Amino acid sequence: MAKAKFERTKPHVNIGTIGHVDHGKTSLTAAITIVLAKTGGAQATAYDQIDAAPEEKERGITISTAHVEYETKNRHYAHVDCPGHADYVKNMITGAAQMDGAILVVSAADGPMPQTREHILLAKQVGVPAMVVFLNKVDMVDDPDLLELVEMEVRELLSKYGFPGDEIPIIKGSALQALEGKPEGEEAINELMDAVDSYIPQPVELRINPFLMPIEDVFSISGRGTVVTGRVESGIIKVGDEIEIVGLKDTQKTTCTGVEMFRKLLDEGQAGDNVGILLRGTKREEVERGQVLAKPGSIKPHDKFEAEVYVLSKEEGGRHTPFTNDYRPQFYFRTTDVTGTIKLPADKQMVMPGDNATFTVELIKPIAMQEGLKFSIREGGRTVGAGVVTKINN
């Protein structure tokens, strides 16, 4: 049977299942596709198809991720599910699968467990804007008081990590019953998808955000001036717009006097376009790879920040030994490497390969930076870690 093409008439949202191992994330993912397939909103996908997730590489890190897509009455969703806990950690820190929202799966029989906490904390650190809770395996709990207790625990945990625990929708159900086609099982899935539709906000389109373009290359064109090339990360750039060159050196102001793509002149470049931008009165040596062009005032250069980082294991091609305080690797932001020094928290002596950790970094040169910015840690040209800026310190 030929696959039907998804018509992109509905708004698109990226979502993922998170939660403790064996609480039913993959069963729930399968159940959503199977229930929505009945109304033509999905291709029914079996549990073992999702569980045998293919490996992908993101910034030199191998991650197993399963992707399914489905639609509700209101939206089109791309849904990621990871088989292992380490895959989740890597996925969230590298941003390999951008999440506009998450479904936190908690087993009603067990209540919140260590990875439940860790996934909520990570979601907060990496800026997942909203989540909905599916209290799974309720068919295994006979005592309604116990269900209420687990729900209270989950709400307290969400509040503790900065999510609005009191208002987050918690749907009770059983993914297994839904997979077996039982009406109460399917009903809970439909209720969950209604909650996801209404509670998880529609992401802001990249075009609407302020203009930002990381500089990849700089050329001088005789008689015309300096051209910088790169891929527009967000926003729109028009001929005549004032822009700032931010990072590595003092911020400079300039004006865009031309935008071209595939050697053709354009009126504007927008998020996703690979463009060349002609800068008025800027000399070739005043601009370099690693800086960004940005809407004036929208982003500032910083050299001190806190980060949540995943350190590659030896098997993944990372370091063979732990690192300690004052470790000085290269931090690769957008298009360039900058040396920085790592300061570990007082209670941490070292970070082992395969760990995730929170620490402070001090760069030798400032980089255009905002919270949520992703980076790689490199040593001698190979990736040894991946991180996300969680807080700017200066």
Curated annotation (Swiss-Prot):
A GO CC annotation given for this chain: cytoplasm
Job description of the protein: GTP hydrolase that promotes the GTP-dependent binding of aminoacyl-tRNA to the A-site of ribosomes during protein biosynthesis.
EC numbers, comma separated: 3.6.5.3
One Pfam family per UniProt: GTP_EFTU_D3
Superkingdom as given in the UniProt entry: Bacteria
A GO term for molecular function: guanosine tetraphosphate binding
CDD domains linked to this entry: EF_Tu (cd01884), EFTU_II (cd03697), EFTU_III (cd03707)
This protein's UniProt keywords: Cytoplasm, Elongation factor, GTP-binding, Hydrolase, Magnesium, Metal-binding, Nucleotide-binding, Protein biosynthesis
Ranges where the record places region G3: 81-84
Transmembrane segments: none
Location of the region described as G1 in the Swiss-Prot/TrEMBL record: 19-26
Catalyzed reaction equations: GTP + H2O = GDP + phosphate + H(+)
Protein's recorded name: Elongation factor Tu
Residues at which Mg(2+) binds: 26
